[in-house]
Structure formats: structure tokens, C-alpha cells
Design a protein with these regions (language model features):
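Conserved PLP-anchoring active-site segment centered on the Schiff-base-forming lysine
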Residues: 90-105
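Active-site phosphate-binding strand-loop segment of PLP-dependent enzymes
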Residues: 111, 122-178
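N-terminal "arm"/small-domain region of PLP-dependent enzymes with the aminotransferase-like
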Residues: 1-42
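PLP-dependent enzyme catalytic core of the Aspartate aminotransferase-like
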Residues: 1, 6, 319, 328, ...
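Conserved N-terminal alpha-helix of the aminotransferase class I/II PLP-enzyme fold
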Residues: 33-81, 88, 102, 110
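Conserved PLP-binding catalytic core of the aspartate aminotransferase-like
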Residues: 286-317
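Active-site C-terminal subdomain of aminotransferase-like
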Residues: 195-277, 291, 360-362
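Conserved active-site segment immediately N-terminal to the catalytic lysine
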Residues: 171, 185-196, 205
């Protein structure tokens, strides 16, 4: 790669498109003749107001977001959203969660602070290596919403068919597949995504919420900042937002629009993932962690024959220019995160490396 860059398979913060980084670098000292960097710019300035409004407009175009949905840029990332969702949506104090891995478990633990949580399906019995059947969930009449983690970054599963929520509001953590494929926003009540995986710099989440779910009658204990209405009423400018992340995300939105949109991204991501999964399924040395029908196209966990060899593979890969292949500490093994910005040649080069490693160790 140019600039002595490595192929970065990190689950997040993750790769950004090289052309986007070049554009950001060209503007970092003096943005569009303003005489200052976006990092130095007042969030109330007309220049930044234009950055913010254009970023939202481009995201709406990319995702075909209906007019009755608000787009919010909220500081804090996913951990804050684990709390904001139940704080804002638990009107009856009951919510249903599908337990599919590490991140849905964290969301469940946080939601239990604010009300009753019913786990309506789980794949914990097989170490989250598959997605449970969600076609006939036992959803109580008084449930406020059904929550899923649409792509489990650590465990490597992804929904390819949405659950039947029986008319209840669907809430989805889309962090690690956000903007990787087309999305019918109208099927959801709320979508949120930490941006550091597939969009831009860490420290922010994008929230897409249907307007009728933005409540004013929240319990008094809900802080002002943690109310979706606060951000919706202020157009994401209630306080100083993460200006730099908004700006960088906006650049990525423009990149996606000029490179075929989400339909083109979905095709490229399918091609990339197929290269890696086909190798893993043929390998006599490496093993894919997830059953075929539930595999993520973004996060690919896999194992070598032993923990010691997992560590050796990751170290050897790093030395060869393939960085951040070590699996998450909670599950071990190896993991290749191949988000939008990872070029197909990066995945092909990784497969060539793994083939060579296998040949030398079998």
C-alpha cells in the first residue's frame, strides 16, 4: 500500500478510505479558505453549520431516510446508547432483547437498570456461533420495543432477515454493518451506530429515530443530555458536538455516494467476504467460527488449531503488514474485520498469507 500503510483489520477504530484521508489531510490546516482547521472551528460558525447540514443531507440520501425520522449525531459512542435506548423508550418499563453475543449482552445488562428485560431468544448455548430463530418470538403485549445487535462485532454473526417483532418497535445496534448494505429504515423505530467501525473517528454515535418515539414525558432521573429530544430539538448542537468526527463522517458519506452508494458497497463486501470464507471453509488448518447462514460480511472470526498458533499467526501477520488480526480477548482466536474501506486486494493478500502459513505448518 502507499504511504507505507498496512492492511488494518481492526474491528474499530478501523480503516478509512485512503482517498478520504488524502482529502482530509489536504484540508486539515485551512478548511476551504476559512484560515483554520475544522478541529479549531466554532460549532456555531456558519462554516461548521454547513458541514453538519451537508453531512446529514448526504446520509439521508445514502440511506433513503424517510422525512419522519430524525438524524442525531451524539457523543459517547455505543456505551452511551446502551443506556439512552431504555431511558428514552421504556415507557411501560418492559423491553425484549435478542441475546446474540458480547454487545447485545452489554445492552441487556444496561437496560436492566431501567426496567424489566425479557430475553426472547438467545444463542448462548453454542457460544454465540449462530443466530437464534426470530420468526415467532414470545413478545409480551406491554413490551416497549425489541432490541437486536444486527452485527455482533466480536462473535461475527449478522442478521440477513430481520426478526418478526409482531408490530413492536424494532431497535437495532448497526455499529459494525452501518452503511455496508442497503437498509429499509422504515422497518425500524430506532437505528444507532458507533461510527468508529465503518464510518469515521471514534467518539460519536449516529442515531436515526422515528419522530413519534422522541418523548418529552421521561422520568426526572434522565439527564438532559441523555434525552433524544434534547438533541432533536437542537439539531445535534445542544452542546459542542464531536465536530471533527462529524466532518470526517461527512467525507465518508460523500465517498460512498460517488462510489455507487450502498448497493455497490454491498456487492463489494459480498465479494471480499466470499474470498476469505471460501478459503476458511476449504482449509485443513483454519476454522471459521460461525455457521454459514449467519456469517457477518464485516467481521470474520476464525481459529487455528491452538491458542499458541493463534498468537503466532497474529504476530507473523503483523510482521508481514496485516495488522490487528488478534481475536477479541473474550473469545480468543483470530478475527479479520473487512469493512467498506478494506480493498479486495487486502483480503486477497491476507488469504495468500494464510495459505502460505498453513502450507508451512502442516
Amino acid at each position: 500500500m502507499r504511504y507505507d500503510r498496512v492492511y488494518n483489520f481492526s474491528a474499530g477504530p478501523a480503516m478509512m478510505p485512503e482517498s478520504v484521508l488524502e482529502e482530509i489531510a489536504a484540508e486539515v490546516l485551512n478548511y476551504h479558505g476559512s484560515g483554520m482547521s475544522v478541529m479549531e472551528m466554532s460549532h456555531r460558525s456558519p462554516v461548521f453549520q454547513e458541514i453538519l447540514s451537508q453531512s446529514e443531507a448526504d446520509l439521508r440520501t445514502l440511506m433513503h431516510i424517510p422525512d419522519n425520522y430524525k438524524v442525531l449525531f451524539v457523543q459517547g459512542g455505543g456505551t452511551v446508547q446502551f443506556a439512552m435506548v431504555p431511558m428514552n423508550l421504556m415507557k411501560n418499563g418492559v423491553a425484549c432483547y435478542v441475546e446474540t453475543g458480547a454487545w447485545s449482552k452489554k445492552a441487556i445488562a444496561e437496560a436492566k437498570r431501567y426496567g424489566e428485560v425479557k430475553i426472547v431468544a438467545s444463542s448462548a448455548d453454542k457460544n454465540f456461533s449462530y443466530l437464534p430463530d426470530c420468526s415467532n418470538l414470545d413478545i409480551p403485549d406491554n413490551a416497549d420495543y425489541v432490541y437486536i445487535c444486527e452485527n455482533e462485532t466480536i462473535n461475527g454473526t449478522a442478521y440477513h432477515t430481520l426478526p418478526d417483532t409482531k408490530g413492536k418497535v424494532l431497535v437495532a445496534d448497526q455499529s459494525s454493518l452501518f452503511l455496508s448494505r442497503p437498509c429499509d429504515v422504515s422497518k425500524y423505530g430506532l437505528i444507532w451506530a458507533g461510527v468508529q467501525k465503518n464510518v469515521g473517528p471514534a467518539g460519536m454515535a449516529i442515531v436515526i429515530i422515528r419522530e413519534d418515539l422522541i418523548r418529552e414525558d421521561l422520568p426526572k432521573f434522565v439527564p438532559t443530555y441523555l434525552r433524544y429530544k434534547t438533541h432533536a430539538d437542537a439539531d445535534s448542537l445542544y452542546n459542542t458536538p464531536n465536530c471533527w468526527s462529524i466532518y470526517c463522517c461527512g467525507k465518508v458519506f460523500q465517498y460512498l455516494l460517488t462510489n455507487g452508494g450502498l448497493e455497490a458497497m454491498a456487492q463489494r463486501n459480498e465479494e471480499k467476504a466470499t474470498v476469505l470464507y471460501d478459503f476458511l471453509d476449504r482449509s485443513q488448518f483454519f476454522t471459521a467460527a460461525v455457521r454459514k447462514e449467519d456469517r457477518s460480511l464485516m467481521n470474520v472470526p476464525f481459529f487455528s488449531p491452538s491458542k499458541e498458533q493463534d498468537a503466532e499467526v497474529a504476530a507473523s501477520a503483523k510482521a508481514a503488514g496485516f495488522d490487528n488480526l488478534k481475536g477479541h480477548k473474550s473469545v480468543g482466536g483470530l478475527r479479520a474485520s473487512i469493512y467498506n474501506a478494506m480493498p479486495k486486494e487486502g483480503v486477497e493478500a491476507l488469504v495468500d498469507f494464510l495459505k502460505k502459513y498453513e502450507a508451512e505448518h502442516t
